[in-house]
Amino acid sequence: MTENKKILLIEKQIKVATYDIDFAGIVSNISYIRWLEDLRLAWLEKYFSLGKQIEAGFIPILLETQIEYHHAIRIFDQPVGLMWVSRLHSHKWRVKAEIMVQDKVMASAEQKGVFVDGERMKPIRIPENLKLLYHQEKETTLT
């Protein structure tokens, strides 16, 4: 899944805790989902503040998560999470993520979502400032 163009990339250290480990001694599937949420929140903090979105009257809604587990992560591993925007449509967004240990991709994921009007809870177009940020970085990444 590793791509050359990781637009609006966030990188975050992940701490494996004892409660992340299942009876087989490896990280439980549910922990990966929590880590994706942590990555998405860190991404929002860096690029598109959730607080500012709420103030502007809209919120991001997750529609779908797909994850593929490539290798097991264990208690003393030191994973790093990467997340980036892979695509913006008129109304939908898509992010991809990788959980890595050293240079090895342990899990890869894709999430899809929309922004909704905070009062009506109806989908809205991708906010202009996010589209602008995405396209600016996409252009600089390509050059």
Where are these regions (language model features)?
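Terminal targeting signals and extreme-terminal segments of soluble enzymes
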Residues: 1-80, 88-143
